[in-house]
């Protein structure tokens, strides 16, 4: 079982990352669940076990899935077929769901800036943090004029100091050492 999970994880992670980037998590979850059901079908299962060339297997499998799987989903299925991994589709779908559940958790991020941030700047910061942390982010913004310019972002154990005050402090430390 651990071996199947190990094999499935990179495929699930790649699909999840792609789905996040394209804001298509729900459609990818549906596609993977459908493809997993197809792979467990009693007629299809023996074909996955061997004998068929990978390109023919991918073509057949994609044909069975039909419109339920979009072009990017078909590309994933082709790669999995080329590597003889279509049998682990149920585990890929399960791993994908686990990644979705983890991602659905929200993390609070504190953003301290020298001046008030516009809603567009807050949105940009939020999107960047969501990509980096692979979680939904709720921003708590505050103003500290002593930063001179820039921002300090704190999210969990991640601290990003992009303030002028921080840069001056690091420069001072470097010069004193």
Curated annotation (Swiss-Prot):
Subcellular location: Cell inner membrane
Tree of life domain: Bacteria
GO molecular function terms attached to this record: proton-transporting ATP synthase activity, rotational mechanism
The keyword Heme is annotated on this UniProt entry: no
Designated name of the protein: ATP synthase subunit delta
Gene Ontology cellular component list: plasma membrane; proton-transporting ATP synthase complex
Function: F(1)F(0) ATP synthase produces ATP from ADP in the presence of a proton or sodium gradient. F-type ATPases consist of two structural domains, F(1) containing the extramembraneous catalytic core and F(0) containing the membrane proton channel, linked together by a central stalk and a peripheral stalk. During catalysis, ATP synthesis in the catalytic domain of F(1) is coupled via a rotary mechanism of the central stalk subunits to proton translocation.
Protein's organism: Shewanella sediminis (strain HAW-EB3)
Keywords: ATP synthesis, Cell inner membrane, Cell membrane, CF(1), Hydrogen ion transport, Ion transport, Membrane, Transport
InterPro entries: ATP_synth_OSCP/delta_N_sf, ATPase_OSCP/dsu
Family per record: Belongs to the ATPase delta chain family.
Pfam families found in the cross-reference section: OSCP
Subunit organization: F-type ATPases have 2 components, F(1) - the catalytic core - and F(0) - the membrane proton channel. F(1) has five subunits: alpha(3), beta(3), gamma(1), delta(1), epsilon(1). F(0) has three main subunits: a(1), b(2) and c(10-14). The alpha and beta chains form an alternating ring which encloses part of the gamma chain. F(1) is attached to F(0) by a central stalk formed by the gamma and epsilon chains, while a peripheral stalk is formed by the delta and b chains.
Membrane topology, record value: Peripheral membrane protein
Major place of residence: membrane
Cysteine pairings via disulfide bonds: none
């Amino acid at each position: 079982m651990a071996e199947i999970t190990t094999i499935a994880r990179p495929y699930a992670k790649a699909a999840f990352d792609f789905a996040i980037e394209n804001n298509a998590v729900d459609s990818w979850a549906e596609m993977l669940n459908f493809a997993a059901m197809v792979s467990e079908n009693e007629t299809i299962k023996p074909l996955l076990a061997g004998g068929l060339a990978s390109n023919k297997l991918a073509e057949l499998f994609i044909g069975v899935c039909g419109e339920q799987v979009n072009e990017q989903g078909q590309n994933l299925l082709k790669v999995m077929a080329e590597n003889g991994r279509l049998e682990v589709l149920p585990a890929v779908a399960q791993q994908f769901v686990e990644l979705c559940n983890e991602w659905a958790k929200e993390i609070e991020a504190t953003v301290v800036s020298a001046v008030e941030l516009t809603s567009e700047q807050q949105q940009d910061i939020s999107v960047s943090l969501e990509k980096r942390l692979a979680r939904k982010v709720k921003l708590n913004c505050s103003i500290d004029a002593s930063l001179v310019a820039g921002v300090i972002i704190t999210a969990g154990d991640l601290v990003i100091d992009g303030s002028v005050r921080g840069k001056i402090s690091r420069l001072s430390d470097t010069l004193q050492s």
